[in-house]
């Protein structure tokens, strides 16, 4: 397989995985801690030797690959909500990479979280609150806010709101990586078959 396409597809799976977790949280108010940790940990890997270093939990990433098959493949069951969130994340990512001050602040704040992890787990409420505030302070104001749909009772809970923002930050991290690896929106239209084929092969590795 083309190594660049494999890496790019891995990063794209990371975006969809985090977005799907946002959707699940918004609807149900809960998310498996291991799955949450797997996505949040990607935020902290800022200087990886290779793409695989960003995604340590390969089992969780399988869900992202399956979402690629569903969203870009021939399935008639495409999730329009996932697509809407994806469009929002990619739009904010473009704004972020054009903002030198935003990128600088983001790196500084992520370093603070890394220091916080000397004392707390990444799924600790204090760490999640910190990650959520990074999204609110730096990302959210760059462009139109992503409107999250779900169960109003769940969405009113502060911890659910914070986890959703933290996961949107994780989706942004994968979006930045995807773009760094040469990912472009037009690939999602004109190179869909290659992306889907790569996702299928990655599922069997």
From Swiss-Prot:
One cellular component term from this protein's GO annotations in UniProt: cytoplasm
Keywords associated with the record: Cell inner membrane, Cell membrane, Cytoplasm, Membrane
One matching Pfam family: DUF489
SUPFAM superfamilies xrefs: YcfC-like
Intracellular or extracellular location(s): Cytoplasm; Cell inner membrane
Keyword Cytoplasm (UniProt): yes
InterPro entries, A to Z: HflD, HflD-like_sf
Membrane topology: Peripheral membrane protein
Family statement drawn from the similarity comment of this UniProt entry: Belongs to the HflD family.
Protein name: High frequency lysogenization protein HflD homolog
Species per Swiss-Prot/TrEMBL record: Shewanella baltica (strain OS185)
């Amino acid at each position: 397989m083309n190594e660049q396409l494999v890496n790019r597809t891995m990063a794209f799976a990371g975006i969809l995985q985090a977005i799907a977790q946002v959707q699940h949280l918004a609807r149900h108010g809960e998310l498996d801690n291991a799955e949450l940790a797997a996505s949040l940990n990607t935020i902290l890997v800022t200087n990886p030797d290779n793409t695989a270093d960003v995604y340590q939990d390969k089992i969780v990433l399988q869900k992202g690959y399956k979402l690629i098959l569903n969203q870009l493949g021939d399935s008639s069951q495409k999730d329009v909500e996932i697509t809407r969130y994806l469009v929002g994340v990619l739009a904010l990512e473009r704004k972020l990479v054009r903002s030198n001050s935003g990128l600088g602040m983001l790196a500084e704040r992520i370093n603070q979280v890394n220091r916080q992890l000397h004392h707390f787990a990444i799924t600790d409420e204090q760490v999640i609150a910190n990650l959520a505030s990074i999204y609110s302070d730096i990302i959210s104001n760059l462009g139109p806010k992503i409107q999250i749909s779900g169960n109003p009772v769940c969405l009113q809970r502060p911890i659910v709101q914070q986890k959703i923002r933290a996961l949107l930050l994780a989706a942004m991290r994968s979006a930045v990586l995807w773009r760094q690896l040469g990912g472009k929106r037009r690939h999602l239209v004109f190179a869909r078959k290659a992306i889907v084929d790569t996702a299928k092969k990655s599922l069997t590795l």
